[in-house]
Amino acid sequence: MTTVLLVDDEKLVLRSLEKTLLRAGYDVITAHDCPSGRDTFAQNAAKIEIAVLDLNMPSFDGMPKTGAGLDLLAELKKQKADLPVVILTAYDEVNKAKDAVAGGASAFFVKGREQGLVELIQKILKG
């Protein structure tokens, strides 16, 4: 079974996405900010096959930061360079999408259509 690391600071969004991914047959490990995402990944790196990270959440200093997900992306890629990563955002920001992909993300996904996220993950994992 595929294991997904899901990191989002909004509890309701985290729960909704987690339920969607569980129903789709994935194992899901959750975290709520950059430090917990990094630590959770470090403890489970061998089994995590893809990460889904919120773009805007508390950064490593605990303060909310626009683009903090890109910082976490960089940290995860240091630990596992070939890790596929999807960056989530509530905002359809083309420039941030380009930043995410340039920073090593596999894709960028605008929150709100959970089933679309499942389809995107399936597509990425199939290569």
Regions found by a protein language model. Give the residues of each.
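Two-component signal transduction core modules
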Residues: 51, 85, 108-109
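Conserved phosphotransfer cores of two-component systems
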Residues: 42-46, 75-83, 103
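C-terminal output helix
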Residues: 95, 112-123
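Acidic di-acidic motifs
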Residues: 8-9, 54
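Alpha4 helix (beta4-alpha4-beta5 surface) of REC/receiver domains from two-component response regulators
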Residues: 63-67, 71, 78, 91-108
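Two-component/phosphorelay signaling modules centered on CheY-like receiver
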Residues: 11-30
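Acidic, metal-coordinating helix/loop segments flanking the phosphotransfer/catalytic sites
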Residues: 30-54, 60
